[in-house]
Design a protein with these regions (language model features):
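Acidic, PIN/NYN-like endoribonuclease modules and their adjacent C-terminal/linker elements
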Residues: 124-128, 134-214
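Short linear capping/connector segments at secondary-structure termini
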Residues: 93-99
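Alpha-helix/helix-capping structural signal
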Residues: 26-27, 53, 135, 154
Length: 214
């Protein structure tokens, strides 16, 4: 299992690597963080995957009043995600959930199992389980596997360091937002407030700006 242990040291992204990401629902709920990750996937700088339970959780939460979305708009978002990334949906991970009994929060066992299934599906490739809740999906739960739970800001920062094109992709992304318009400075402030401060700083530097956290 030396390879598994080695995968959890050093940078999260290697030069020339297209990281394999399994996304927890909580990183798909914030509009702009979701846009950042999915635009990078569309540019083939990362590969994204999720499970049916993850999408169900996204749907359930986006219908809460604080997100200001209608059932129709949520359905369209999920339909667009499925259409844009037809290979992202991972099925058949339920049998792996018992492996995480007592290791993760019971409600997040399906996320852990999905990430492990993804690693095995790709012949033991490292998988970054991108989550905003490391406490419920601790690294210890994935000992002797090639799955590493990481916060979104950490993987985005390392990806930018290895792939300067990240800055160009996100610059182009901003052109889609019109009502309201979102400037570079706006996005940096949003990322900073979304626990992605180090990434916001690095992205601001790439754009020749300073993030709001500096």
């Amino acid at each position: 299992m030396a390879a598994a242990r080695a995968a959890k040291t050093g940078p999260l992204v290697s030069p020339g690597q297209v990281p394999l990401l399994y996304l927890d629902a909580n990183v798909l709920l914030p509009e702009y963080l979701r846009a950042v990750i999915l635009d990078l996937a569309d540019a083939e700088l990362v590969r994204v995957h999720w499970g049916e339970q993850v999408l169900a959780e996204v749907q359930r939460n986006l219908l809460k009043p604080k997100f200001g979305m209608t059932p129709a708009s949520v359905d369209k978002l999920l339909r667009d995600m499925r259409n844009a990334f037809p290979d992202a949906l991972l099925l058949g991970s339920e049998a792996l959930e018992p492996e995480f009994e007592g290791k993760t929060d019971p409600k997040d066992a399906h996320v852990a199992a999905g990430a492990l299934k993804l690693s095995r599906r790709y012949g033991g490739q490292p998988v970054l389980l991108v989550t905003g809740n490391i406490r419920h999906l601790p690294e210890l739960a994935f000992r002797d596997t090639l799955v590493q739970p990481v916060r979104p800001g950490a993987v985005l920062k390392d990806l930018l360091a290895m792939q300067p094109a990240v800055a160009d992709v996100l610059d182009a992304m901003l052109q889609r937002f019109e009502h309201p318009a979102v400037s570079r400075e706006d996005l940096l402030a949003i990322l900073d407030a979304s626990n992605c401060r180090a990434f916001a700083t690095a992205l601001g530097n790439a754009w020749g700006l300073a993030s709001s956290g500096d």
